[in-house]
C-alpha cells in the first residue's frame, strides 16, 4: 500500500508541475527574451512591431525564457546531466563485468542499471542534446530571429525534467524495485514485472516523446517559414537539411511509439490483451517498437552527420564535396529507415520471404551512408587540413562510423544475424554508432561553436587530451565487445564463464578511459567559459579565407560589433574591451585558431 501511495503521489506531483509549466508559459509573450533588430535575422519570418522587455535576472530568466539560444543552453545542461547519469550507470555495470562472478552489485540492480543506461542515453541525452544545438544554431544558420513557435519551444523543453524523474523513479523512490525490462521493454517480461517503476518509466517516455514531437513541428515550421530573404532552398546548410529530415522521422515514429506504450500500459493495468499470449501477440510489440526504434537510430545519427558535414570542410580548406548528393542521401536515409525494422526480428520466426525483403532494404540503406563517407573523405583529400579539436573529432567520427557501419552490414545478412543476434557483437556495433559517431560529432560541435556561445576560447591541450583519451577508450571498449560477440557471449548478463574475462576487462578499462575523457571535456568547458581567453576576432576559425563564413558567424560578428544585442539589449563587448579587460588574444594562449 505504501508503494502504491508513493507512486500515486509522484504521478500527481508531476501532473501539477506540468499544468503549472503550461499555465506560466502561456502568459510569457511579454517576457520574450529577445528584441528583433532590423539588420540581424528576419527575412520570411521577420517579426516587426514587437516591443519586449529585457530578460529578467537570475534564475527567473532560465525558468521563463523563450529565447532559442537560452533554450538551447537549457537542453545542453539537461543532456549533460543525463549523460552523467547514464555514464555512472554503465561504469557500475562495467566494474561488475570486470570479474566473471557477482562481486559489486546484484543481478537485479545490474538489470535496473542496464535499463536506465539505455533509455537515458537514447531518450534523455541523445535527442535532447541534438535539440540543444538545433535550437541554438538553426535560427542563426537560416538568418531567422527565433524559432517559429518560441513558447512551444519552451514547453517542449520543460516536459523533459519531469520525464527524467519518472524514468529514474525506481532509483529515486525508496521501497520500489527498479524497472528491469531493458530499453526495448519486450513483452511478456514488461507485462509481468509488477513494480510501479515500470509504469512510471513508460509515462516518462510519453513525456519525452511529446517533447520531441513538439520540437520536430517547431523545426519544420522554422526551416520552412523563418528563413531569411537570402536563404533559399539551394542555400540551406547541410545541418538544417539533416534537422529537417530528422524532424520528419520524429513525426512519423514517435506518435506510433506513444500508441504502443498506451497499449502496454493498458495491458499492465486494465486487463487488455494487446501483447499477451491469451488474446494478442508478444511479437506485435516488437513490430511496433522497432518500427519506431530503427528510425530513432537515424533520428539520433542524421543531425550529427550534418554537423560533421558542416564542420569538416571548414578545416579542410575546401567546400563539402558533392553537397547535393549529401542532401539526397540524407533524404534517402529518411525514407528507407521505415522499411528495415524487421532486421531486428530475424530470429523470431517471421516468414522467410519477409525476412529476405527486409535484408535487401537493410543492405540498401547502407548505400546513402556510404555516399556520405565517400564525400567526407574526398573533401579531406588533398585539402589543407587543420587538426583543431573540432576537426579531430570529425575525423574520429568518420573512423568510428565506418567500423559501426560495416559491422552493421554483416548483421543485415540473415545467416550471420542468426548467429550473432543478442550477442555482444550487436552491442559493440551499436555503440560504435551511438558514442563513437554521435558522441564524437557532438563534441566537435561543442568545440566549434564554443567561441560563438561564450566569446571565449577553450584550452587546446585539454581538448586534444579529451580526443585521444576518448578515441582510445571507445575503440578499446567496443572492439572488445565485437570480440566477445564473435566468441558467443550473450548480452544482458551480469555474470559469465571465465573464458570471456580478458575481453571484459579490456572493455572495462576502455569504459573508464571514456569516463576520464568526459571529465576532461567538462572541466575544459566549465573553466574556459568562466575564465578562458576572449576571442580576438569575430572569425576565430579564419573561415573567410576559404569562403566558408556562414550565417551563424555573421550573426556573431553583428552581435560583437553592435551596441544592442539581439537577445535583450545588453551592451556588446567590443574587441578593444576584450583585450583591455585582462583577456589575452587566442593566438598568444594555449588555444586554437
Curated annotation (Swiss-Prot):
Binding-site residues, Fe(II)-heme a: 117, 431
Reactions catalysed, as given in the entry: 4 Fe(II)-[cytochrome c] + O2 + 8 H(+)(in) = 4 Fe(III)-[cytochrome c] + 2 H2O + 4 H(+)(out)
Gene Ontology biological-process entries: aerobic respiration; electron transport coupled proton transport; oxidative phosphorylation; respiratory electron transport chain
Statement: the UniProt record of this protein carries the keyword tRNA processing: no
Disulfide bond positions: none
Binding, heme a3: 429
Gene Ontology CC terms: plasma membrane
Region of interest: Disordered: 562-593
Covalent cross-link site, 1'-histidyl-3'-tyrosine (His-Tyr): 294-298
Subcellular location: Cell membrane
Segments traversing the membrane: 5-25, 71-91, 122-142, 154-174, 204-224, 246-266, 288-308, 320-340, 358-378, 401-421, 425-445, 467-487, 506-526
Listed InterPro entries: Cyt_c_oxase-like_su1_dom, Cyt_c_oxase-like_su1_sf, Cyt_C_Oxase_1, Cyt_c_Oxase_su1_BS, Cyt_c_oxidase_su1_bac
Keywords carried by this UniProt record: Cell membrane, Copper, Electron transport, Heme, Iron, Membrane, Metal-binding, Respiratory chain, Translocase, Transmembrane, Transmembrane helix, Transport
Gene3D superfamilies: Cytochrome c oxidase-like, subunit I domain
Membrane-protein topology: Multi-pass membrane protein
High-level lineage: Archaea, Methanobacteriati, Methanobacteriota, Stenosarchaea group, Halobacteria
Protein name as catalogued: Cytochrome c oxidase polypeptide 1
EC number in record: 7.1.1.9
GO molecular function terms attached to this record: cytochrome-c oxidase activity; heme binding; metal ion binding
Similarity remark: Belongs to the heme-copper respiratory oxidase family.
Record function comment: Cytochrome c oxidase is the component of the respiratory chain that catalyzes the reduction of oxygen to water. Subunits 1-3 form the functional core of the enzyme complex. CO I is the catalytic subunit of the enzyme. Electrons originating in cytochrome c are transferred via the copper A center of subunit 2 and heme A of subunit 1 to the bimetallic center formed by heme A3 and copper B.
Pathway(s) the chain acts in: Energy metabolism; oxidative phosphorylation
Pfam families for this protein: COX1 (PF00115)
Binding site for Cu cation: 294, 298, 343-344
Major localization listed first in the record, in broad terms: membrane
